[in-house]
Amino acid sequence: AFKRLKTDKKLVIAGGVSDSGDYMNTLRALAAGDDRILFTDFVDGALRDELYSNAYLFVLPSDLEGMPLSLLEAMSYGNCVLVSDIEECTNVIHDRGITFRQGDVNDLEAKLRYAIEHPIAVRMFKQLSSDYICDRFQWDKVVDATLKLYQTP
């Protein structure tokens, strides 16, 4: 989807995948010849902070997730997020991000284009993101809710 867009923005595909190396090899082959697309292995520390802090948009095109920690992290850094419309992602972002239909490359392309062409909307989502996620998933609140769950007969 990204290769179809005319933009000077970069796409950083960070981290590994849980499936296999074959998937990453397929992605690398699809990205061949496009110097806007960069691959990293697993990132943490200062590099992770740098990527989150400077991202225009965080994209999570998952088909299957548990509680997507990378999504929580991205939002805590105040990123505008674009996620597939699977329940695990939509339950996290509610109306504070952009969704696309799972597995629909054309819809992903359309939403990427929207984000690139509407920086004011992206800025609005960035402003909504951090406070919301840090309040909703604050450790003390999560611990209290978990404790109540275990104490319920």
Task: Please annotate each region the language model reported.
Residues M24-A46:
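Nucleotide-activated donor-binding/catalytic signature segment of Leloir-type glycosyltransferases, i.e.
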Residues W139-P153:
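C-terminal alpha-helical cap of glycosyltransferases
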Residues C80-V83:
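Short hydrophobic beta-strand element within catalytic cores of glycosyltransferases
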Residues Y114, A121-D135, A145:
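A short, well-ordered alpha-helix in the C-terminal region of glycosyltransferases
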